[in-house]
Amino acid sequence: LGARLSTGSDLDVSTVYFSALRDKLDPSLELFADVVLHPAFPEADFQRLKQQQLVAIQREQVSPVQMALRVFPRLLYGENHAYGLPLTGSGTPESVQQITRDDLVRFHQTWFKPNHATLVVVGDITMDELLPKLERLLAEWNPGDVPQKNIQDVPQKDRSVVYLIDRPGSEQSIIFAGHVAPPEANPRELAIKAMNTVLGGAFTSRINMNLREDKHWSYGARSMLMSARGPRPFIVYAPVQTDKTAPAMLEIKKELDGIVNGQKPVTPEELDKVQRNLTLRLPGRWETANAILDDLSYVVQFGWPLD
């Protein structure tokens, strides 16, 4: 068929994706529908992937960056929040050891419902052509109730807390700082992203210029906002030379306080640079079918208006 078919998951959604040539659409759609409705979950493949995941967790537990990504969400959200799992996406050794093929089947039966799904299609096809094909292939897909995930707000901490993972012999320290930010779908999202770009979201951002270019303590430091429907992680990441760990933490706090507390607000020049950068990106955002698909999927996932 020359088609591409893949599946994936993130903090909020699971996806089934396929891409096919127009003259191969019908057989490709049949394969797509079969995966959505009747996933096989072969036992041999399941056991192989399970062992691969356990090995991946072992590797993560000796990598400083991966170690931090594993524990950081639990510190932000607590044990019972849906976002409190390791950001590596690999889970815990205990949960992976205990999972069975039946758990996969139950997950699919519980969550994969047509009333809980959205189909985004981009290509040389009309709705009049596509809809009858989908109605025929997905006719047996029955709606039903789905559980509610715990993505509630978490209380903001009233003071800063430092957690240390002691790893003797490390060549450098890995600093993760952050807190819980508003969900992606909020009326001030553009302003929040602009703020993050100035703070640590670009090479010329304040944190990177401070720790890399001015102090020469790091090869690169940055801040990031992860995408999520619920309260999402805001993270500052900085690998620094070991003897500058404490001073680097103070510099990061200084840069955060400068924006948050208004001690060093975003300048007109910084804002203009961010605005021009975002504007110049726009023409190329819809150049390919996949680019359009990504943007539309983003709109659907976070409930943005189509305009």
Predicted regions and their residues:
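PEST-like low-complexity, intrinsically disordered acidic/proline/serine-rich tracts
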Residues: Q58-Q66, P147
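Short, conserved secondary-structure transition motifs
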Residues: A20, Q53-E60, D153-D166, R276-R285
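An aromatic/glycine/proline-enriched structural segment found at the starts
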Residues: H81-Y83, K113, T118-P183
